[in-house]
Design a protein with these regions (language model features):
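Conserved eukaryotic protein kinase-like
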Residues: 1-148
């Protein structure tokens, strides 16, 4: 299961950067590094939409952290301290698939082009990840916001 990260650690170890990777309905995502000098890059989602109780959030974290599949990003940690909520995921160095389709509004990365064989590999990977969520995961996961 993902480990708890305290907000103070999140502010000093994760928020000491200015690279905003994106923003969605639940909050902004930033690039940071795992604490302890390991230089492992992570993606930190700072949640602004805080519906539900802390217990609801912890239940969701438990469910998400049980999902383990090569086509699903791993949850490494979380923060639930007072009103602060954050999710710490592994960092995907090639970025989100939407960069290849739309480009990025947060930096100067232009739209990237994919060859058909690579696009096919991505489609198959997305399908395998969704299949795992629907049929292969021991815990039933209702997925509303799948991002390929």
């Amino acid at each position: 299961m993902a480990g708890e990260v305290y907000f103070r650690t999140t502010e000093t170890d994760y928020m000491s950067f200015s690279v905003k990777l994106g923003e969605g309905g639940y909050g902004a995502v930033y690039r940071g590094q795992f604490p302890g000098g390991s230089n492992v890059p992570v993606a930190v989602k700072l949640l602004t939409n805080k519906k539900g109780t802390g217990e609801d959030f912890e239940n969701e974290v438990t469910t998400i952290s049980r999902a383990s599949h090569c086509n699903i990003i791993s949850l490494l940690g979380y923060c639930l301290e007072g009103s602060h909520r954050a999710l710490v995921y592994e960092y995907m160095q090639n970025g989100s698939l939407d960069l290849y389709k739309f480009g990025s509004i947060f930096d100067s990365i232009e739209r990237k082009q994919l060859q058909w064989h690579k696009l096919y590999e991505i489609i198959v990977g997305v399908a395998r990840g969704i299949d795992y969520l629907c049929t292969g995961c021991r815990t039933q996961i209702v997925h509303f916001d799948i991002k390929p």
